[in-house]
Amino acid sequence: MELVIAKHAGFCFGVEKAINTAFKEIKNNQKNNSIYTLGPLIHNNQVVSSLESHGVYTKDSISEIDDGSVIIRSHGVSKATYGLAEEKNLNIIDATCPFVKKIQNIVEEYFNKGYKIAIIGNPEHPEVIGINGWCNNEAYTVQQITDVDLIPKLDKVCIVVQTTMPIVQYEELSTLISTKSNQVEQFNTICHATKERQESAKLVSQEVDAMIVIGGYHSSNTQKLVAICKEEKPLDTYHIETVVDLDLEALQNYNRIGITAGASTPIWIVDEVVKSLRNL
């Protein structure tokens, strides 16, 4: 069996920054103050469990935190959430991905200039929810073509996109949204790491008999990788979270297997999968 590992796979810059920020806070916490993350730091259960073993616990809202430090997750949060944390005198540690922070700044700037905001992305994803919180939660969120029909004619509109959206989906939807106004400011805010991982996964999936995509089942960027691989290998793409999820009986029937991993997947999880397959 030959294994082909995607050139771009695993931790992205934003995720690595968030994890390093969290463990730095753990190391510097000499007074054993309470440390929390607002929502899962990243969409990876193994990393979240590791943080909990070091005394960093996940809370869903500021109302659940009375003291100590709160780490803002890589997906970012609304402007109002910062205000609530400040009101409670919490120590705010901002681990927002820099690329997400850039979107928040764009949205706030153009909203204050009188633009309506259109966010291309999943309205239920924490990144999109957080971004919407920088324009008073008044954005039009567009995930599919039918969502564009709900947007009225606008004087001026600013278009941004969730960092993990497929480029093809962004291009199609942004073109349609642009027809809603004569004054359009458009920003392709897809993270370059997302684009690299998607392109790399597509290339590998064209060269192998089966694809394994490693990443959290709730990870948006991992789900996008699965969808891309299934375009090439609809019946031979396997989404797993860890090595224990491998269907070794099915996989031993393939000659060439491709491997990629979501941006929230630690390298040690990838290594465990590779080792297990090489022992077949």
UniProtKB/Swiss-Prot annotation:
Pathway named in the protein's UniProt entry: Isoprenoid biosynthesis; dimethylallyl diphosphate biosynthesis; dimethylallyl diphosphate from (2E)-4-hydroxy-3-methylbutenyl diphosphate: step 1/1; Isoprenoid biosynthesis; isopentenyl diphosphate biosynthesis via DXP pathway; isopentenyl diphosphate from 1-deoxy-D-xylulose 5-phosphate: step 6/6
One Pfam family per UniProt: LYTB
One MF term in the entry's GO annotations: 4-hydroxy-3-methylbut-2-enyl diphosphate reductase activity
Binding-site list for isopentenyl diphosphate: 43, 75, 125, 219-221, 264
Catalytic activity, EC: 1.17.7.4
Disulfide bonds: none
Residues that, per the record, bind dimethylallyl diphosphate: 43, 75, 125, 219-221, 264
UniProt entry keywords in alphabetical sequence: 4Fe-4S, Iron, Iron-sulfur, Isoprene biosynthesis, Metal-binding, Oxidoreductase
Enzyme class: oxidoreductase
Residues given in the record as (2E)-4-hydroxy-3-methylbut-2-enyl diphosphate binding sites: 43, 75, 125, 163, 219-221, 264
Residues annotated as binding [4Fe-4S] cluster: 12, 97, 191
Domain of life, source organism: Bacteria
Catalytic activity: isopentenyl diphosphate + 2 oxidized [2Fe-2S]-[ferredoxin] + H2O = (2E)-4-hydroxy-3-methylbut-2-enyl diphosphate + 2 reduced [2Fe-2S]-[ferredoxin] + 2 H(+); dimethylallyl diphosphate + 2 oxidized [2Fe-2S]-[ferredoxin] + H2O = (2E)-4-hydroxy-3-methylbut-2-enyl diphosphate + 2 reduced [2Fe-2S]-[ferredoxin] + 2 H(+)
Active site feature: 127 (proton donor)
CDD domains: lytB_ispH (cd13944)
Family annotation (Gene3D superfamilies): 3.40.50.11270, 4-hydroxy-3-methylbut-2-enyl diphosphate reductase, catalytic domain
Function, as annotated: Catalyzes the conversion of 1-hydroxy-2-methyl-2-(E)-butenyl 4-diphosphate (HMBPP) into a mixture of isopentenyl diphosphate (IPP) and dimethylallyl diphosphate (DMAPP). Acts in the terminal step of the DOXP/MEP pathway for isoprenoid precursor biosynthesis.
Similarity remark: Belongs to the IspH family.
Name of the protein in its database record: 4-hydroxy-3-methylbut-2-enyl diphosphate reductase
Lineage start: Bacteria, Bacillati, Bacillota, Clostridia, Peptostreptococcales
